[in-house]
Amino acid sequence: MVFDQSLGDLFVIRVAGNIVAPSQIGSIEFAAERFGTRLVVVLGHSRCGAVLATLEELQHPSGGSHSRNLRSIVDRIRPAVEGLLSDGAASDPERLLEEAVRANIRASAEQLKHGSEVLEQLIAGDGLIIVGAEYSLNTGVVDFFTGVPAPA
């Protein structure tokens, strides 16, 4: 358990690479409208395999050897990470993956904030907060990115 919550306490949507697609947006809209969810956490994790697959595809194109479904995941992650390859991080594969994981989490959180009229309205007028965070597979610690409200 990451947040020490019981079954039914959290509305959880799991998807490789924490990508944002219409089904995930619809699920979040449902949770926010139906159940009053006011905190959405885009939780990625260190050494994410989907992000790694995207980096590998960008560095060494496979020419379509991935399935159409896996390619759809890679294609959704690509815009968040491709700019890092021209950065200094590209010379250090471990650092590149770390930065790419965080960039992908941020991009997914931003997509949710600005990719749904329903969520935009809930953010503007009803206190919905969308934040990114990274779970460390090594330590079990969740590192929340900026924008998390202080506890009351």
Regions found by a protein language model. Name each.
Residues 42:
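Conserved functional hotspot residues or short segments at active or partner-binding sites
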Residues 46:
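Short, charge-patterned binding micro-sites
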Residues 2-15:
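Short helix-loop-beta junction
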Residues 8, 17-38, 49-152:
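Divalent-metal-activated hydrolytic enzyme cores
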